[in-house]
């Protein structure tokens, strides 16, 4: 048995960027079929990370629907891993720095996501994984009051940690440069330090956004590499060490 990280395919590309003004969504069944068919040199995906939003997996799924989902994943030999909580206003959530009502909506979606995560664990299909969140607000709106808004986001995240702890779940703030208070690596570190709950919330980011952090794309003051950076291996390694130390 190896100790390498498990290779999971994310399901959210089937929904993100899709819709009436773009290409149609890719169904969860199709995403699972494509994931199962992928094979590079004998390496296959061992699981999937789920987007808890319709038309894939409704955040309001019933226990029977979650059980059916677990059975479907098991049929492919997949484990469930990370879960994306739909914390944004268009999916029923609200800004983490918004009004009391908006923040309550944000936390409601976190609670529902943690409940689904717990159910999947109890069904034996999800041995590990986090619940992914972000600030659900734009960089532009955040910039109207950086200090005050960062405090509000941190307070909302702390409440989210309390919710996750009640379900035995862990949270991860998704490092994407489009989210207010998270648009630069120093701001992301600052936010996590303000939350002050490292036992309950961590950080995750795809490689593209990790590289955008080093470039300071949405936060030039946090840029690590020089403006004329040419992606040399040594320079990139140094930047990533700075980012992750």
Predicted regions mapped to residue ranges:
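Surface-exposed cleft-lining segments at the edges of enzyme active sites
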Residues: 97-101, 138-148, 173-180, 218-228
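Glycine-rich, phosphate-binding/catalytic loops in enzymes
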Residues: 65, 149, 188-190, 220-222
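Active-site groove signature of glycoside hydrolases
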Residues: 114-146, 167-178
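Histidine/acidic-residue-rich catalytic or RNA/ligand-binding cores of hydrolases
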Residues: 185, 214-220
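Basic- and aromatic-lined ligand-binding clefts that recognize polyanionic substrates
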Residues: 166-196
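Short, small-residue-enriched loops and turns at beta-alpha junctions
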Residues: 55-58, 90, 138-140, 177-181, ...
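N-terminal pre-domain/capping segments
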Residues: 1-127, 147-150, 155-165, 197-205, ...
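Adenine-nucleotide cofactor-binding loop residues
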Residues: 208
């Amino acid at each position: 048995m190896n100790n390498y990280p498990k290779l999971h395919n994310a399901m959210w590309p089937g929904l993100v960027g899709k819709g009436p003004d773009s290409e149609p969504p890719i169904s969860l069944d199709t995403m699972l079929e494509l994931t199962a068919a992928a094979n590079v040199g004998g390496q296959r995906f061992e699981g999937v990370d789920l987007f808890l939003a319709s038309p894939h997996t409704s955040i309001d799924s019933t226990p029977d629907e979650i059980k059916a989902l677990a059975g479907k994943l098991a049929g492919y030999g997949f484990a469930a891993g990370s879960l994306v909580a739909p914390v944004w206003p268009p999916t029923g959530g609200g800004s983490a720095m918004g009004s009391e009502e908006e923040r309550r909506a944000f936390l409601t979606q976190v609670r529902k996501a943690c409940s689904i995560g717990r159910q999947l664990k109890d069904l034996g299909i999800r041995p590990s994984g986090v619940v992914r969140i972000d600030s659900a607000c734009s960089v532009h709106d955040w910039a109207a009051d950086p200090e005050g808004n960062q405090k509000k986001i941190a307070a909302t995240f702390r409440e989210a940690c309390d919710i996750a702890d009640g379900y035995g779940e862990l949270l991860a703030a998704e490092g994407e440069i489009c989210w207010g208070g998270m648009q630069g690596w120093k701001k992301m570190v600052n936010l996590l330090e303000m939350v002050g709950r490292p036992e309950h919330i961590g950080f995750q980011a795809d490689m593209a956004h990790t590289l955008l952090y080093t470039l300071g794309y949405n936060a030039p003051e946090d840029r690590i590499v020089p403006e004329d950076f040419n992606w040399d291996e040594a320079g990139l390694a140094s930047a990533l060490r700075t980012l992750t130390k």
